[in-house]
Amino acid sequence: MPGGYGVMGDDGAMDYSVHEAWNEATNVYLVVILVSFGLFMYAKRNKRKIMRIFSLPPPAETLSEPNFYDTISKIRLRQQLEMYSISRKYDYQQPQSQADSVQLSLE
């Protein structure tokens, strides 16, 4: 290519493929910028609608949250009751073993 990188053709005429590609690229960029700007303006005006779409899962999550804490409190209550029953069993068994030990020490 004696004339350069695609600027001059074989017959000496200007090769406009670079200019056409540039024009198409700038048109695409312009369309992308305009669409982005339009979406930004739409999002700014309809912020509540968009936020309502993304905020649907949290109400279902808040319903499960009290159940989670209820189950934790029930588990804690059950543990406390088990510990109380174990301590009561130990208290009932303790005087007998003390009486036995006292009897053994007296003998």
From Swiss-Prot:
Q: Tell me which GO cellular component terms the UniProt record holds.
A: membrane
What's the protein here called?
Small integral membrane protein 19
**Source organism:** Bos taurus (Bovine)
Q: Which family does it belong to?
A: Belongs to the SMIM19 family.
Q: Which Pfam families match?
A: UPF0697 (PF15117)
Where is it localised?
Membrane
Q: InterPro entries per the record?
A: SMIM19 (IPR029368)
Q: Which residues cross the membrane?
A: 20-42
Lineage here is:
Eukaryota, Metazoa, Chordata, Craniata, Vertebrata
Q: Does the record bear Transmembrane helix in its keywords?
A: yes
Q: How does it sit in the membrane?
A: Single-pass membrane protein
- Which residues fall in a coiled-coil region? none
Tell me the name of the encoding gene.
SMIM19
What keywords are annotated for this sequence in UniProt?
Membrane, Transmembrane, Transmembrane helix
